[in-house]
């Protein structure tokens, strides 16, 4: 037979502790239920608000929607107009930049062409200046410079003398007459070598010789009857060898003036260099106002002692390549 087991009787302290524990558990459960209820209520409220908003949107009329569309279209048109204005401004700026660039390029082209034409004109003028004065054109070497042409084209006012380092004697004739000694059998011509000037060496080259305008060519001359004619073939012997001193310029100028007065030539008839081909009888080489060069025999053509002054000797030194001068 089963035995009956009796539980032990709880004490008062144990009973109070058990009661307190049960009450705390109940309170905790109640709080949890309250929190869950609050969350549910909040969700319900949010859902209700969404529903109300949706209902309000659905209740909006068609006119209100049209008004909103018109406002948005106006705003779009304003933005498009601003875009068009900005595009036009950009196009205008680009067009002005293109015009300015073309203008600068045109100015640069004009300046370049003007500079080219000026240089071409200067080059052509220099070439014509080098060719002028010789009928042969390109056959004559262009060694005649502008300074020599200026000296030959002007009168005795531009007669210049060069001071040379040499002997102290002055190579010049008397102011009245040149010193010539007649010699029928002499060989005084263009092929005669120049006389010797002593042991001193000349300090100048043939290109630096004294060139003064004279009315006489270096070979044959237009002779006029003189009281005491001399033959062309004569030895030219200076009384004293040497070079021009600075003081001999006055006597040289007097001799030139005296020679021009004796032969009938004026100072205005300054001579310019002429190419040797001008003596050939080719047509068109000599113009009508030019002086003809008469080739006369040595026995008949003569001139006075004043017809050729002393300073003509530098022209005789060009024996290999004589230069003729004409009006």
Curated annotation (Swiss-Prot):
It comes from the Eukaryota. Residues 14-109 form a coiled coil. Sumoylation regulates its subcellular location. Sumoylation at Lys-45 and Lys-71 regulates the shuttling between the cytoplasm and the nucleus. Sumoylation at Lys-71 is required for interaction with TBL1X. Sumoylated at Lys-45 and Lys-71 in mitochondrion. Desumoylation by SENP1 leads to relocation from the mitochondria to the nucleus. Ubiquitinated at the C-terminus by SIAH2; leading to its degradation by the proteasome. Interaction with TBL1X and methylation at Arg-323 protect GPS2 against ubiquitination and degradation. Keywords: Activator, Coiled coil, Cytoplasm, Host-virus interaction, Isopeptide bond, Methylation, Mitochondrion, Nucleus, Repressor, Transcription, Transcription regulation, Tumor suppressor, Ubl conjugation. There is a cross-link at residues 45, 71 (Glycyl lysine isopeptide (Lys-Gly) (interchain with G-Cter in SUMO1)). The keyword Metal-binding does not apply. Widely expressed. One of its GO terms (molecular function) is transcription coactivator activity. InterPro entries: GPS2 (IPR026094). The modification Asymmetric dimethylarginine is found at residues 312, 323. The keyword Glycosyltransferase does not apply. The modification Omega-N-methylarginine is found at residue 323. Residues 61-94 are annotated as: interaction with SUMO. Component of the N-Cor repressor complex, at least composed of NCOR1, NCOR2, HDAC3, TBL1X, TBL1R, CORO2A and GPS2. Interacts (when sumoylated at Lys-71) with TBL1X; leading to protect GPS2 from degradation by the proteasome. Interacts with UBE2N; leading to inhibit UBE2N/Ubc13 activity. Interacts with TRAF1. Interacts with TRAF2. Interacts with TRAF6. Interacts with PPARG (when in the liganded conformation). Interacts with (sumoylated) NR1H2; interaction with sumoylated NR1H2 and NR5A2 onto hepatic acute phase protein promoters prevents N-Cor corepressor complex dissociation. This is G protein pathway suppressor 2. It comes from Homo sapiens (Human). The gene is GPS2.
């Amino acid at each position: 037979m089963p035995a009956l087991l009796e539980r032990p009787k709880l004490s008062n302290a144990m009973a109070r502790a058990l009661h307190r524990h049960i009450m705390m558990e109940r309170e905790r459960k109640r709080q949890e239920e309250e929190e869950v209820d609050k969350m549910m209520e909040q969700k319900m409220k949010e859902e209700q608000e969404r529903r109300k908003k949706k209902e309000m949107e659905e209740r909006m009329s068609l006119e209100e929607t049209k008004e909103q569309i018109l406002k948005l279209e106006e705003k779009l048109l304003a933005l498009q107009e601003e875009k068009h204005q900005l595009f036009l401004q950009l196009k205008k700026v680009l067009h002005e930049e293109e015009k300015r660039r073309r203008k600068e390029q045109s100015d640069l082209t004009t300046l370049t062409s003007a500079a080219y034409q000026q240089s071409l004109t200067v080059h052509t003028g220099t070439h014509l200046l080098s060719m002028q004065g010789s009928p042969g054109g390109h056959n004559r070497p262009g060694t005649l410079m502008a300074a020599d042409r200026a000296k030959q084209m002007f009168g005795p006012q531009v007669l210049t003398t060069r001071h040379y380092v040499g002997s102290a004697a002055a190579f010049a004739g008397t102011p009245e007459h040149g010193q010539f000694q007649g010699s029928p059998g002499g060989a005084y011509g263009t092929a005669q070598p120049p006389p010797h000037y002593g042991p001193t060496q000349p300090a100048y080259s043939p290109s630096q010789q004294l060139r003064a305008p004279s009315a006489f060519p270096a070979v044959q001359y237009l002779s006029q009857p003189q009281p005491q004619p001399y033959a062309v073939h004569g030895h030219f012997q200076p009384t004293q060898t040497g070079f021009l001193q600075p003081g001999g310029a006055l006597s040289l100028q007097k001799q030139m003036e005296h020679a021009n007065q004796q032969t009938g030539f004026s100072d205005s008839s300054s001579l310019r260099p002429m190419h040797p081909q001008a003596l050939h009888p080719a047509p068109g080489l000599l113009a009508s106002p030019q002086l003809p060069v008469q080739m006369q025999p040595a026995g008949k053509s003569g001139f006075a002692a004043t017809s050729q002054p002393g300073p003509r000797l530098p022209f005789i030194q060009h024996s290999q390549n004589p230069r003729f001068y004409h009006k």
